[in-house]
Swiss-Prot record:
Xref: SUPFAM superfamilies: ApbE-like
InterPro entries the record matches: ApbE-like_sf, MA1715-like, UPF0280
Protein name: UPF0280 protein Msp_1322
Family membership: Belongs to the UPF0280 family.
Organism this protein belongs to: Methanosphaera stadtmanae (strain ATCC 43021 / DSM 3091 / JCM 11832 / MCB-3)
Length: 244
């Protein structure tokens, strides 16, 4: 796919920071604003939607609230653990409604994508040597695919100490909540112990993901099937994505 056929946008709305690459030329910002308003209105009506660290009952059945609540139920987290991944997933669904064949939606590191080309993407794992030096080669995904990351020093609350807990799933909403849940169990006295504990806990959710990769310091471990790990030398890949 020639790069000039892609529409590349950065959309910032308060705490939502979207990087978009898509073959669809449309103004998606009003859609994102609407999803945010739905979430904020729910928080006003039900403050526990924001505060809970455990699953809560669904009251309003708007699609994005259903995604967040379901993801929380699966991963045993509160719905806000899935907020970034759910916004990404809703944006991808919106682009798919226009027959998109290539779309990448990144929301603060939580990614929903559908591609007809291989792409390379970098890993960010704090101050470890893996950050910006290694990444993944993602095969074409003609269906929805989610890649979400949680870390102890990220913008969202984590009770674990992993530098990166990366989950690959068919839904970015679920990948997001699972990254939080699995990352919460990444604790221990050594790097190996942190990685082992997170991956051991991940096994109970194996029906909901394709693979999980955990990084602590200079130690890396994985379970399930993850994309091919690659060394990255291209500066562009370190900052975003490279299309093959």
């Amino acid at each position: 796919m020639p790069k000039n056929t892609l529409h590349i946008k950065n959309i910032d709305i308060q705490t939502t920071h979207i990087m978009l690459k898509t073959d669809i030329n449309c103004d998606i910002k009003p859609f994102i604003q609407n999803q945010r308003e739905i979430i904020l209105n729910e928080i006003k009506e039900n403050p526990n939607f924001l505060k809970s660290y455990t699953p809560i009952p669904l009251i309003d059945k708007k699609p994005i609230l259903k995604l967040m609540t379901k993801a929380g139920e699966i991963a045993n987290t509160g719905p806000m653990a899935a907020v970034a991944g759910s916004i990404s997933e809703m944006c991808l669904d919106y682009l798919e409604s226009f027959k998109s064949k290539f779309s990448i939606v990144e929301n603060g590191g939580d990614i929903a994508l559908k591609t007809n080309k291989k792409i390379n993407m970098g890993i960010y794992a704090g101050k470890t040597s893996f950050s910006y030096n290694y990444g993944f080669k993602i095969k074409p995904k003609p269906y929805k695919y989610g890649i979400c990351t949680s870390s102890y020093d990220g913008p969202s609350k984590s009770f674990g100490s992993t530098d990166a807990t990366i989950v690959f799933s068919k839904q970015s909403s679920i990948a997001d909540s699972l990254a939080t849940s699995i990352g919460n169990y990444g604790n221990g006295n050594t790097e190996n112990e942190v990685v082992h504990n997170a991956l051991s806990y991940a096994e109970k959710y194996s029906d909901y993901y394709e693979g999980v990769l955990v990084i602590k310091g200079e130690t890396l471990g994985k379970t399930g099937h993850i994309p091919q790990l690659i060394s990255i030398n291209n500066t562009h890949v370190k900052e975003a994505f490279e299309i093959e």
